[in-house]
Every structure is written in C-alpha cells, then in structure tokens.
C-alpha cells in the first residue's frame, strides 16, 4: 500500500429530458457515446441512471481532475443522446415508476423487490480508501459508524422531489433505507461475523446476491479498500472532492486508533437511526447528533467541525488541510446541494429553476 492511502470515487448520475426535466431511459445510448470518448460507464438498476468511476488516485488534485473530465465527458454523451446529465440524488420531478435496465440481474431484482426497485432512481457517491486487509476494513467500519450521519449531512443533495420540497435535505436517504440490506452497517467483531450476516441475508431472500450488500460502509468485493457509500451524489466536483478528502483522512485516523488499540464506540441501532433521520432531515442547515461523545444534539456544522478537528493530523499528513478548510468555508457561503436546490425552488416555485441550477452545478 502507498505511504498514504490511495482513493477512488464512484458517482451516480440521473439522465433527464432536456425540456421537461423528467427522468429519461437513455442509459445505453449515453454509455455508447461515452465509450466513443474513452469513458466506460456502469449501467444502474434503472435505465435513467449511469455511474462513473475514477481510477486509483493518490491526491485530491488527481481526483478533481478525473471527476471533472468524467462529468464533462458524460454530459456531452448525454447531450448526444438527447438527455441532460444531473448530479442530483433524487429526481426533482419523477414518473410513476422508473424503467428497469434491460439486464437479467436487474430484472430478477425488480421481480423480487417490486416497487422498491421500480421507485429506485436515486444517486449516491462512493469513496474507496485503500486498507491493508479485509479484516481491517471491517474493524474501521465499526469505528466509522458514529460519523456516518454527519457525512450524510455534508453531502445532502436531494431536497426537491415530485415537484415539491420533501422536507428533507436528503430524501434519498429515506428512500434508500427501505432496502433490507441498506443503511448503516451493523457492528461486526470479525470478518467471519460479517460473512455470516451476508449469508443470512442471502438465505432469507433479503438480498439477491452479494452485490446487494448496500450498507453505507463495506469492504469492497473487488478492491483492497473500504468503501464509504453514505453520501448523496454531491452537486459539484468541489463538493465530491471535499467529501473524499474528509473520508480518506477519517479512515487514516481510525486506522491509527485501531493500531493504538483505542476503544470502539458501541452505538445502538436506534441511536444511529435517530441520528441518520436528523441528518437526512436537516442536512448542514440544522441539528446533528453527536454519537462519538455526548449523544446530544448540536448544530450540524459544529459537529462537522469536531470531525475535522479530529482528523486534522491526517489532513496535514496528506496535504489536504487547506483544501478542506477552504471547502468548508465555501459551503458556509454557498451551501451544499440541498441548500442550493431550495434556493432555486424558492425563487418562483418552478421545477425548471431547480433543474437548471442542478445542471449548472453538475459541470461547475
């Protein structure tokens, strides 16, 4: 493993009609045009979504460059396909149900999970951070659990849904939580315990296959990484880079705690669910729950500051401290995706204004 952990980022995007802003089933066309430009896309469960993936990166400058290239290339591919690319975690305006991608596995998922699958159409971002072993990934996952809600608040980008303010900064979180294998991971004492839980979910039918391990943190099935999946897809490249930098430094800090034998916080499922709900509702604009220390409510921005203070040595070690400091100052001035959506909505109550603001931020 490199001197500092490498990272990789995956982002999911929505494809919409350029005129109405409604989701449009063009993923295969967009993937074909993107491939002509040298970018391979992953097709998601619904045919109105695509996913990009960076290569392995050692610096946030590299992550930024790759994300910018991917977003601009896929936006052009979408335009060539008669669609518009949006970095938004739920569609601001939606059909009754989403068409499922024509793929045998996705058809099996739709058959088993019914409207859960057909109402999917949600977009997240996943950050992979290199770790020494799968066992270490699971132990770090246990230590990450208290911080997952505030990371959700940081990236919240799904306030407007079905032509209305949802009342949540991250409505995606509320939709995603309906899946039986989604949400915060349980505390696992070992990789064997993790594997036993996965087997139980498979045997019960709650998962079709191991690709449906949807927990917000998991050891990657394909790479020697821990994958942090809690985020709404951020509105801008800068927001995604900020999230990735904080995640890497948090993992580095928790790896150090693991080496030092520091205690692991035990958090009840109910406390974690309550903290998730509050962060999904308020985002950065309101209250979060401090699960690491007091278990008391505090302003979300203050709790994010507590996390950044905690990981500052790691941020300095990889040269990301100024990036994170400046990124948080920018969020104070401009807001995150959910706040920008609401600002656009409040101007006239017109969904077209939200779509335009999201599209502009996607390529900012």
UniProtKB/Swiss-Prot annotation:
It catalyses: L-cysteine + L-glutamate + ATP = gamma-L-glutamyl-L-cysteine + ADP + phosphate + H(+). Its EC number is 6.3.2.2. Pfam families: GCS2. Transmembrane segments: none annotated. InterPro entries: GCL_type2/YbdK_subfam, GCS2, Gln_synth/guanido_kin_cat_dom, YbdK. Coiled coil: none annotated. GO terms for biological process: modified amino acid biosynthetic process. Belongs to the glutamate--cysteine ligase type 2 family. YbdK subfamily. ATP-dependent carboxylate-amine ligase which exhibits weak glutamate--cysteine ligase activity. HAMAP family: Glu_cys_ligase_2 (MF_01609). PANTHER family: GLUTAMATE--CYSTEINE LIGASE 2-RELATED. This is Putative glutamate--cysteine ligase 2-2. It comes from Mycobacterium sp. (strain KMS).
